[in-house]
Amino acid sequence: LNLIADCAVVVAIHGYSWEIQETMLGGLDEKLKHRMGRQMALAGLDVKLDNHPYPGLHENNICNRGQLEQGIQLELSDALRGGSDEPTVIQSTRSVLLKISQECTP
């Protein structure tokens, strides 16, 4: 927790066992979650925002332990990690985070 103590928003990345290339997004930051989901969907990725087993809504979830007490988590399937869509996930995530950091820079 010391690592994220000075972070306003935390983005946690986890993996789960599944043979389909997909991403499940969770966390309490609904705006960021939908923004990330929109970017991933535009890139052609299979992304789930709701009604999945990893919503990341508990206040003690690592993604919700930053200064703003809300963040997002990316749950990446086994098939996605190391699969053909992995670079697209990385690019989509970086794109959104870069835009956010530019919006926060005076």
What are these regions (language model features)?
Residues 1-105:
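Catalytic cores of processing enzymes, dominated by hydrolases/peptidases
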